[in-house]
Curated annotation (Swiss-Prot):
Protein's name in the database: L-lactate dehydrogenase 2
PROSITE patterns assigned to the protein according to its UniProt record, in alphabetical order: L_LDH (PS00064)
Keyword Cytoplasm: yes
Organism: Lactococcus lactis subsp. lactis (strain IL1403) (Streptococcus lactis)
Domain of life of the native organism: Bacteria
Amino acid sequence: MKITSRKVVVIGTGFVGTSIAYSMINQGLVNELVLIDVNQDKAEGEALDLLDGVSWGQENVIVRAGDYKDCKNADIVVVTAGVNQKPGQSRLDLVNTNAKIMRSIVTQVMDSGFDGIFVIASNPVDILTYVAWETSGLDQSRIVGTGTTLDTTRFRKELATKLEIDPRSVHGYIIGEHGDSEVAVWSHTTVGGKPILEFIVKNKKIGVEDLSNLSNKVKNAAYEIIDKKQATYYGIGMSTARIVKAILNNEQAILPVSAYLRGEYGQEGVFTGVPSIVNQNGVREIIELNIDAYEKKQFEKSVSQLKEVIESIK
């Protein structure tokens, strides 16, 4: 699929949708940005507010409220709509209500004649990416969930902070569910190209026992933020904009998005967070890491849990 107009439609103008829109405008990613919401006044107000800052951005951009007919010639439709996670709720607690919302949205998008790429940011993202694919009839590669992109950047940031290293020099992934069963891939985590276990032997800033605590902190990061401010949106806003950028610029970038497994990691028939090559066609290829036995077992548990939830909503 060739990117033509750099037109992106964002469905849902809550905290997440507007954070994604704001991030895309600031980075000069789009030529046209259309906001859709069940509350038309909200969409119009957000568009007007964003327009007030366009002249300070990197590129001139059209920003407006619209409707589903605007999806027809869009390159990307980003879906953020759904009920929000409340304090004490897991992301999977949201599944029944948000699955119904996702089916309704995707049906209306496809009825417009849309032939682009979906980026799904609604939670639980792995399940709703599956629902979007099943409803759309598009190839799995064209449905891209945000997956563990945010978890991975949290992981790198936390480890970098402990080691007093620039996060851009720390490489590693969180895979599996964007949620409580996510898996930190320590076996492929490196600092300046050096495996983490080798690095900490000489670094002395953290020990092996600290690694488990760190991955748990990453897993629970959203709960801490929700307890303090009721919602998370800036981090996922910037993470989603990064995925959009990779698609629009045909980057061939490796990002841990929610992608459809066809035997990779010994699993199939589910969308979940795995390192994937992302380009103008969506997910070009999944990168299959040679994870260790413990990580493989945890990943299998994560995928199994997702499959159970998918079966429950069919």
